[in-house]
From Swiss-Prot:
Recorded superkingdom: Bacteria
NCBIfam families in UniProt: PRK02101.1-1, PRK02101.1-3
Organism of origin: Pseudoalteromonas translucida (strain TAC 125)
Protein family (similarity comment): Belongs to the UPF0246 family.
Name listed for the protein in its UniProt record: UPF0246 protein PSHAa2558
InterPro entries xrefs: YaaA
Amino acid sequence: MITVISPAKNLDYTTPPATDKFTQPELLEHSEALMQVCRELTPAQIGSLMKISDKLSGLNAARFSEWAQPFTTENAKQAVLAFNGDVYGGLDASTLTANQLDYAQSHLRILSGLYGLLKPLDLMQAYRLEMGTKLENSRGKNLYEFWGSVIANKLNEVLKAEDAQYLVNLASNEYFKAVDKKALNAQIITPHFKDCKNGQYKVISFYAKKARGMMARYLIENKVTQLSQLKEFTVAGYYFSAEASVKELEPVFLRDEQS
């Protein structure tokens, strides 16, 4: 199984990395093309495009102007350790063993508006460019048109290398939309996580994001290859519900109300 997760808006470039191993992103020529567009934007245009504050607009204008190859441990950080959102709290990559990080390096991928597809230990410079951003570019009017089937083709390489038949989608809709499903050579498993609130099971964003990260870790720790093994996920009180799972490849995990 190959797993994909979303990136995070929050970044941590202050905590020293838990490993000195690193690799380079594989789609940097595409990133460079996007950067040429981004560097032309004024802070005001960035704010309007991304719907962010003046302060954040200025920060990201500076990031765009400072972004430069080559990536080193002095000016970049491993992606899985740099992203700092809810998914990454659940994944908790800094506590993975060296062997688990090696396994993650070949079985986990991070979708990215700027980098396309990242390996966990790929060095990454700070940026903000969400996949849903309507950034006009040489290939179209947004990032979905820019990436086209590039991400799916790269995933196919990973799937083939690991002889994997499943792609586990633990990403958000915004990001997974960037994967050209028709070009993908795999069955897609999309787990759903629902928490009980006021007697009803529903998707609660914060909990669901963290659960995606926890499942990504579970798949790494247990080297899961089959759907039946994935359904055995019972971390943090979640459990597979056959009754709630309407589609075979969309397993639903429930968690009862927290006391």
